[in-house]
Every structure is written in structure tokens, then in C-alpha cells.
Amino acid sequence: MFRKGKKRHSSSSSQSSEISTKSKSVDSSLGGLSRSSTVASLDTDSTKSSGQSNNNSDTCAEFRIKYVGAIEKLKLSEGKGLEGPLDLINYIDVAQQDGKLPFVPPEEEFIMGVSKYGIKVSTSDQYDVLHRHALYLIIRMVCYDDGLGAGKSLLALKTTDASNEEYSLWVYQCNSLEQAQAICKVLSTAFDSVLTSEKP
């Protein structure tokens, strides 16, 4: 499938939300980047900046999602090549075609909780935790249509370990692109809240 990427640019439109900090910034942007559908991307290593703030402190938003799979412990050299949203999408596509990730997740639903502490994925009864992604270890989040025609969307997380030596990709399925975009938006707000609270 042919894909054409567009360079992201700073914009004052309602479709772009950017937050700057001393060392990192968050960029949550919506743009037609792939599969002729909307891709929402949250990039915590961006160099963009503007001064929005929102101080919703301890709230946790919950979403029902399915777990597709993960590619863990990518070496630094491999992870560095996965900088943009299209890089992640293409990498996941190839991994699915190679059988490293399934195209369709198992039927079991999980609860994804997003807060200023990060992301927690737990069983639907919330007794068992499947994954925890600390906020400061999340490098990028991308959501996009899965291309299978059922209206489902994939949500991909790129994370690093505490020593920044390895990267991992985590892939979840959302019921719709709107749900996936909502998760990106909540995570952006969580970053915003933490960054705002760090200011003197």
C-alpha cells in the first residue's frame, strides 16, 4: 500500500496542541498522514513549543481496548529509526505481515487507564494489571485506522526503559478512531498537567 507522509508544521489551528518544557515537549497533532484517514500522534521528544496549560491533576480516564501485541527490547539503533508516526505505522505493518504481531487481537477486553502517572492496562475486572507505562517513559503515541475495513483503530505506544537503552512498541486496538484520538488527547492533557505543575 502506498503511503505519502506530510511534514508536520507548527500551526495555531484547533487541530494542533503543543506544550514546551525545559528539556522535552509534547506535540499532539492530527493530520492525514496514512491510510487516507486521520492519524493522531503524540510526540514527547518534539522540538515544538507553545504555551498551553491545563491543570487537571489526579483524574484518570478509562477506555475499553483490546491488546494486539508488543515488540519489546528493540536496540537503540532500531528504535532510533522509529521517530515519526509513519515510521511506527510502517514498522507495525511489516511486523504484522511477518507474523510478529497479529492483525486481529484476541477477544478479551482490557481497561486502559490514563492519568498523570502514565498508562495502566488491566483486566476488565481490574484485578490484574497487564501493563504499566510510566508517563516519563512514553516517547510517542500514534493512532490510526487498522485498514481492515471494520472501523477499528490501532493505538501504538513507543516506550523506553529507565536507562534509555532499549525501546518497545505496544499495540492496542480501539473501537473507533474517535476513541483512539480521545486517548491521545487525555495523555496530552496528562503531560500538560505534569509539565505545568513543575513550573516554579
UniProtKB/Swiss-Prot annotation:
Bias-annotated ranges (Polar residues): 34-56
GO function terms (MF aspect): GDP-dissociation inhibitor activity; integrin binding; protein kinase binding
Residues where Phosphoserine is found: 41
Tissue specificity remark: Expressed in endothelial cells and fibroblasts (at protein level). Ubiquitously expressed. Expressed in intestine, colon, testis, ovary, thymus, spleen and prostate.
Gene3D superfamilies documented for this protein: 6.20.360.10
Record annotation: effect of changing residue 82 to Q: No effect on ITGB1 binding
Motif (Nuclear localization signal): 6-7
Region (Interaction with KRIT1): 136-139
Chain ranges of the PID domain: 58-200
Region (Disordered): 1-56
Keyword Cytoplasm set for record: yes
Modified residues (Phosphothreonine): 38
Regions of compositional bias (Basic residues) in chain numbering: 1-10
Cellular compartment(s): Nucleus; Cytoplasm; Cytoplasm, Cytoskeleton; Cell membrane
Record's GO cellular component terms: cell periphery; centriolar satellite; cytoplasm; cytoskeleton; cytosol; lamellipodium; membrane; nuclear body
Effect of residue 86 to Q: No effect on ITGB1 binding
UniProt feature, compositional bias: Low complexity: 11-29
Stated role: Key regulator of the integrin-mediated cell-matrix interaction signaling by binding to the ITGB1 cytoplasmic tail and preventing the activation of integrin alpha-5/beta-1 (heterodimer of ITGA5 and ITGB1) by talin or FERMT1. Plays a role in cell proliferation, differentiation, spreading, adhesion and migration in the context of mineralization and bone development and angiogenesis. Stimulates cellular proliferation in a fibronectin-dependent manner.
Subunit-structure text: Interacts (via N-terminus and PTB domain) with ROCK1. Found in a complex, at least composed of ITGB1BP1, KRIT1 and RAP1A. Interacts (via C-terminal region) with ITGB1 (via C-terminal cytoplasmic tail); the interaction prevents talin TLN1 binding to ITGB1 and KRIT1 and ITGB1 compete for the same binding site. Interacts with KRIT1 (via N-terminal NPXY motif); the interaction induces the opening conformation of KRIT1 and KRIT1 and ITGB1 compete for the same binding site. Isoform 2 does not interact with ITGB1.
Protein name: Integrin beta-1-binding protein 1
Organism taxonomic ancestry: Eukaryota, Metazoa, Chordata, Craniata, Vertebrata
